[in-house]
Amino acid sequence: MTAEPARAISVMNPWAWRIVAGLQVVVERTWKPSWRGVLWIHAGKDSDLSAPAELWPPAGRLVTSAIIGHVTLADVQGQPGAWRWVLTDPRQLAEPVTGVRGHPGLWLIDLPPGLSA
């Protein structure tokens, strides 16, 4: 039996950090994925500098261009153009996988040996 490929999504900080910390359990997107399951969170190289200071991670915790954890994409609710992705089971990696280039949409990722959901 072949394992299903791992899927990831690139998200700007502080939102990526908030997702894997379990502080953001719903995210809004303009598109609806047909897939559900474990979703690896990639902290993109860019950050949302308009986000209020209280939403940012503690000093020293901000990581960019890295896989920082995973969640389960459990449900998608809404209507065309305004989809709410319901995220459960957040897990933050003790050591982020750095140097990972992000991509738009959901993308397949080759996880390093020994790393699994």
Give the positions of each predicted feature.
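Structured alpha/beta reader/binder surfaces that contact nucleic acids or chromatin modification marks
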Residues: 1-117
